[in-house]
Swiss-Prot record:
Coiled-coil intervals: none
Region annotated Methyltransferase, chain positions: 50-458
Gene3D superfamilies recorded: 3.30.450.420, P-loop containing nucleotide triphosphate hydrolases
Domain Alphavirus-like MT: 72-281
Subunit structure: Heterodimer of a large and a small subunit.
Record-listed ATP binding positions: 833-840
Segments crossing the lipid bilayer: none
UniProt-recorded name of the protein: Replicase large subunit
Amino acid sequence: MAYTQTATSSALLETVRGNNTLVNDLAKRRLYDTAVDEFNARDRRPKVNFSKVVSEEQTLIATKAYPEFQITFYNTQNAVHSLAGGLRSLELEYLMMQIPYGSLTYDIGGNFASHLFKGRAYVHCCMPNLDVRDIMRHEGQKDSIELYLSRLERGNKHVPNFQKEAFERYAEMPNEVVCHDTFQTCRHSQECYTGRVYAIALHSIYDIPADEFGAALLRKNVHVCYAAFHFSENLLLEDSHVNLDEINACFQRDGDRLTFSFASESTLNHSHSYSNILKYVCKTYFPASNREVYMKEFLVTRVNTWFCKFSRIDTFLFYKGVAHKGVDSEQFYKAMEDAWHYKKTLAMCNSERILLEDSSSVNYWFPKMRDMVIVPLFDISLETSKRTRKEVLVSKDFVYTVLNHIRTYQAKALTYSNVLSFVESIRSRVIINGVTARSEWDVDKSLLQSLSMTFFLHTKLAVLKDDLLISKFALGPKTVSQHVWDEISLAFGNAFPSIKERLINRKLIKITENALEIRVPDLYVTFHDRLVSEYKMSVDMPVLDIRKKMEETEEMYNALSELSVLKNSDKFDVDVFSQMCQSLEVDPMTAAKVIVAVMSNESGLTLTFEQPTEANVALALQDSEKASDGALVVTSRDVEEPSIRGSMARGELQLAGLSGDVPESSYTRSEEIESLEQFHMATASSLIHKQMCSIVYTGPLKVQQMKNFIDSLVASLSAAVSNLVKILKDTAAIDLETRQKFGVLDVASKRWLVKPSAKNHAWGVVETHARKYHVALLEHDEFGIITCDNWRRVAVSSESVVYSDMAKLRTLRRLLKDGEPHVSSAKVVLVDGVPGCGKTKEILSRVNFEEDLILVPGRQAAEMIRRRANASGIIVATKDNVRTVDSFLMNYGKGARCQFKRLFIDEGLMLHTGCVNFLVEMSLCDIAYVYGDTQQIPYINRVTGFPYPAHFAKLEVDEVETRRTTLRCPADVTHFLNQRYEGHVMCTSSEKKSVSQEMVSGAASINPVSKPLKGKILTFTQSDKEALLSRGYADVHTVHEVQGETYADVSLVRLTPTPVSIIARDSPHVLVSLSRHTKSLKYYTVVMDPLVSIIRDLERVSSYLLDMYKVDAGTQXQLQVDSVFKNFNLFVAAPKTGDISDMQFYYDKCLPGNSTLLNNYDAVTMKLTDISLNVKDCILDMSKSVAAPKDVKPTLIPMVRTAAEMPRQTGLLENLVAMIKRNFNSPELSGVVDIENTASLVVDKFFDSYLLKEKRKPNKNFSLFSRESLNRWIAKQEQVTIGQLADFDFVDLPAVDQYRHMIKAQPKQKLDLSIQTEYPALQTIVYHSKKINAIFGPLFSELTRQLLDSIDSSRFLFFTRKTPAQIEDFFGDLDSHVPMDVLELDVSKYDKSQNEFHCAVEYEIWRRLGLEDFLAEVWKQGHRKTTLKDYTAGIKTCLWYQRKSGDVTTFIGNTVIIASCLASMLPMEKLIKGAFCGDDSLLYFPKGCEYPDIQQAANLMWNFEAKLFKKQYGYFCGRYVIHHDRGCIVYYDPLKLISKLGAKHIKDWDHLEEFRRSLCDVAESLNNCAYYTQLDDAVGEVHKTAPPGSFVYKSLVKYLSDKVLFRSLFLDGSSC
């Protein structure tokens, strides 16, 4: 900041010197304003008058040392030690600045007159008369007061007001102002004072014994004491005299007596105890009682004065937790007290040694001592021959420079005169490049002779010892150590090994490898060592025998330090880790090093757990004898080679990694299965693995990657087979026309129960009549699939790759030897090229089709390469030398050639690294070229739950070649590529500006008629791709699918308004999308996102800069318990003020433009104009396309203009639009999910997170069906509903898969601007008949009641029938002083996104709560494939899954799904508070928690378009949750309230009154205006343009509370 101000001033001064008069005036004004501001800022600092005469240099010293004050130097008073005396005033004011004004303060040995003059009536001075000097000083202070009062009296003036209270107190109660007792014995009373007490000690703690200081402070209940004292580092040496040059003072030491005086002055000396001062310097804590201590902390050093503070600490606040398992409460409390006492004592002892053990602290507080060492000097008396020794401080660098040089002298040259000559030369000058320069070592010249003697003696001694060592130990080929051991061996014979070990352990003989150890005395000691030794000599250290505990603690500390390099190492529980090491008898340091080596992949072992928690560490370290059931077992025993067919029949097909109790890979070489057909009729259970996260990989990294690739095939096969088995179990005997990505064939009837979208499937899962499930390889004839007699049903899938996975597994299994893959020795070269750099062209130019092999990921790429290679008419590229990766793996060994000279892999970085290693090995090549792009989309693991560690993603290569010239990309895209790649990226394209973007008003506006798209159509997500295909666009692909392809023109489309994680500035998907075209790219998007920002930046790049990228040709190239409090809200009644215009203004500021819409006839316009709709399979009754005319009664007209719409009339078109935009518009985002197994894991997390531990098991003693439960359900129903059940006999069930469909007539208002561009669809209601509800309603009502009773209600709120007051009570114990992250998960299309996985999760929860199996199966079939009928509109259709909005489980089902979703993604064990309601959620986490990629997890596992918000205040169910220091208050959303005041469906005045009462109920809390400011902040988080709204809140209260006034918000529509 200072540099900026200097630069600005310099620039202004240069401007002033210019010739432009106008600019000069402006610059002068600016300089003047700056000077005024600076002087005003200085005037605001405390003012101190410095009356004593000081020199200019001393003036600068005082000013720099105390920048907090504005010091005025008058130089009007000559005095002894004038600088030190003036600094005393500054030091006093500095200490008083640290104390809150008005707090009772004890000035130990202070100047009471100074406090009186400053008007400090709250200071008590303890001024004991310890010597004559003290008496004289006290009398002088009294004289100064008398002198001051006499001057006032002589001038007929009164004591100023700010001093009046202090002087009156001194006149009436002088003992309250000053006493003459020592601070330890002071009798000052604090009866009327209740606040915190402080103390200051200005140059007075010298005379207070350090051992009594803490107790004295506690006796006065002092909170913090600030002190200042003089000290010098040189006092720790043997010097008896030390100067303090800045204040012209000195210390003289004689034994324990330390005298302080000012040089050249006759003032009295001050004598103190040296050991006592040393305690204040070195000690950290000062005990005050058996509970409390005062901890010292240095603050600053200024002008030879050290400032520090002593803070009061209550040691009872140490955490008293101790692990215990048992029922003896007395034993438990005793153990807890013992552990706490040890922890307190250890903490205090450690704090005592902070300064002594921390060299950096010593260097900081003794800056002059850094890199200085203490060297002894020797002398001898000529008369008595008595030798003397003293010490001096010398630069360590100087010492070693001399020693290293003179050690090179020959024996004759090693003389004292030569040493002295060299020392003198380097002290006087040094020669640099022939020029004499000043020496860098400022050593006192008077010491050079003595230092030279020390260096000479030390070197002489070292030379003699070397000669002695050589003469003593030249014993032939054997060393002395070997001779010694030979003698011992002859003496003890066969017992020698144990004798040798005992001798070494008892340290009777000490060896270091092959030489005896000889110790040489140190030349010097460091200042830090001397400080420690001086302190220990002067102070009696407290003795506490904690050596064993300290050693254990040190070992654990070192182990945890070793573990601290790991990610998320802060999650370690030290106690659990310690217990684990003790129980397994593992050395903590060894365990830590093993864990670090494993996690950093330095050990040849990979553990696939994500976080190094204590449980995972224990699991990884325990041996086979102590392993529990299901844990990992690492052994080295021989294992029989298992039979693959036998394993599958028993359901034991195993992973390549270490899983369960299998110690090695089970894919050993076996001749049993030689063809893929032998997989036919393998049991499905043999291919399904429920736990793939407990895998351990061993060996080099390439071997681990290859094992992981095999396991990924097993995992993909497992998930696909598991899902088809589930489909077979869930499919009912029905025949519907809807086509799906999977199919189910009924063998007996030869009918498709579920028709697949594809044909001629190569494999499937067969269900036999015995209800057994097998994987079958399918054959076809003209009638369809050829089946066997014992087959009941066949399930097929067009998505999964089980057939190819089986073939790959067969091939790879044959390559393994003893369960281990072989790694090729071929050279691997990575060719890293930018997009369009001509990788394929380069491959074709380098390949020799006679002896090389080209492998590509996709079939289209292989055909393209063959076509280009054979373009000349000569067939050189065939299916033998240009193949896809899958074809090569599946058909390995079937071709004519098995060995190739060179291997070329195109887009190799999109493959699994283990797959690349296998390809190199299988090709038997000498060199492999892997072409790829390190910045584009890498291999993506799409199997949920399967581990793919981060370091596995890095391909090990021998050489890297780069290609940085793109032949495809235009210049503007090349500009973007330069930001992503190392090195300069150039282009050959003549196109400069090629990218553009267009914001579309909504997803519905993109259709082939109104928006034809140019060129290749790309999307980011599969859901957007399916949406464009359904609207009639052709040839649509995702960005990931076209990586490596080239197109002239590209249209990139985004229809998803919610955040997509792959659309980011540094995302590889964005890079691929921008680099597919050669001429143009246009991006169509419904929202602003990072890609729009990138394109806009590229559009602004000048053509001049783009020319720089052009080239003509390619170049070569621990648990804490916080206080719990509960309080009530402060209530301040809100004034009833404001007008209608206030509400309108506020609404327009928050949602600009919404109030100007004329949407009363939007529904009529849609009916009368042509409309094009993309409809899925459904049946329409066109006879109901024209609704019967109805008389429309006039409604009340609102005075507040909002975006509210008129009620709509039910009809075919209106209902169909609602169905298309809601039920037919479900996203498809999820990846490969093993539904049943993953659902089971999710439900485990749900029960562990939310339910009380004692209620996690279902209560088998109660019945779900009872008269009471039915009566409770009936009591909640309307009379009309009960009447519909009059003819129901409850004997048989109606069709549970048949639903009715209807719409809500009133559109839901959105609090955003979408109404301006979209026609809002009505909300749909899909519901069962009341007969089905009568059966399942009481059932699920009881299950819900049991679930809510089991929830941990202290932390979780499942918002069912809760009032706002109950919400406030739940959140009322949030501590606003604790930093928290407030999280909200917002999910778009929540009901329609729910698929088979969500149903499986919900059914598993109900099953564990006690739902009967038969009814559970009935309910499941009623929600799988369902038929919707809308009798009013004449629409019939079929839906798979989705949440039914009128179901008996709609609300509670949505609630448990959102809770399960969050429990599977977030660390709920850390959660403070959480609330769930339908699709709404609100979570409070401690500040700083780490969260996973929520969007990716929600997409791939839960099929949710979700975004996670971090906020300051929560928003829950249309209400703002405001937590504050007294509790919590819940405010209804005021903007939502205003929006409702614009309602256009109010029938009459009675209806309006009912409407007002309902609004009053929900907005009751707005009557309390105490927290309007926090409400403004909360609203501002959601609506960025919202102004402070207290005026509109009061206006709402005014109108809602007055029945007559509320009527003025509406006009009678019949009279208009």
